[in-house]
């Protein structure tokens, strides 16, 4: 009975894959060797709304001037071409660390797009890109716990690593069976509010926007992730790293960039994420990071070398997200047993310093870093 259930699960969720090896993945870093990054235009921010298994997200990470940290996110997912589901997520970390964070996750109904697929709509929800491609408005009244009314305006060009921002999966790279793409607005101005039952929270400050598409089953795409969003008074540093599953040789892909208002200083696929100290989580055995070192290296447009790093203690985690917590118990047991997955996301937002060297110029700037370490398999 269990083997039958396992097979049925594999058919839909894809819990087992053979070992294809590293030749079956084409990292975006290969493109980035010739073209470190390309600027992302309005055309590069269209929803794909794939009709095969995929997860597509638009995520807005806000670092408010008043100390709040917030996330607003739309998730569009397709399971095996059978069912499409959409979700609006909102999370707010209180500036008082002793207070619980707010989390609202609401299924969306009647999802649709505008004609060129740059804006997303559902009942009581709209995430719209402006005609000139310089700002998003995010409005949601799906949860009375978190009524969202935000405007996110980019203050520097958007970018993607390489020419496409995409890593391909498959034994034939011309006809891949999967992909992961990321595009970023690394430094934005945020304004507006998230209104809770206690009243409105002013989210004037800085923001990062991330567009992501996993054009395959997420737990086939990557086993681990590191995500960094550093926002300082003058500079922003961002990073997205994933490690493919052993099926694809546990290949490491890391994209990131350093920017300031109006200028991409450096972007590409030569950044690194290291957990310099870890402690075993007593509940699930994952090596939870306690100290980190993140580095960026490359060159400016005029060929000045760029080196940057952020390192230090993460402090107490602000959350540990059990990714499968909302999955029904029976299904969760099967998935965990069949796939060997117990996915958790560890979240932190310490104040740390960005050390930046551009040519002979050395800069040190303190800022707020929101960072995640995700363990899937």
Curated annotation (Swiss-Prot):
One of its GO terms (molecular function) is ceramide binding. Residues 1-18 are annotated as: Peripherally associates with membranes. One of its GO terms (biological process) is response to oxidative stress. It is found in: Golgi apparatus, cis-Golgi network membrane; Endoplasmic reticulum membrane; Cytoplasm; Nucleus. It comes from the Eukaryota. GO terms for cellular component: cis-Golgi network membrane; cytoplasm; endoplasmic reticulum membrane; nucleus. It is a peripheral membrane protein. The keyword Aminoacyl-tRNA synthetase does not apply. SUPFAM superfamilies: AttH-like. Keywords: Cytoplasm, Endoplasmic reticulum, Golgi apparatus, Lipid transport, Membrane, Nucleus, Transport. PANTHER family: CERAMIDE-BINDING PROTEIN SVF1-RELATED (PTHR47107:SF1), SVF1-LIKE PROTEIN YDR222W-RELATED (PTHR47107). Belongs to the SVF1 family. Ceramide-binding protein that may transfer ceramides from the endoplasmic reticulum membrane to the cis-Golgi network membrane, and is thereby required for the biosynthesis of complex sphingolipids. This is Ceramide-binding protein SVF1. It comes from Gibberella zeae (strain ATCC MYA-4620 / CBS 123657 / FGSC 9075 / NRRL 31084 / PH-1).
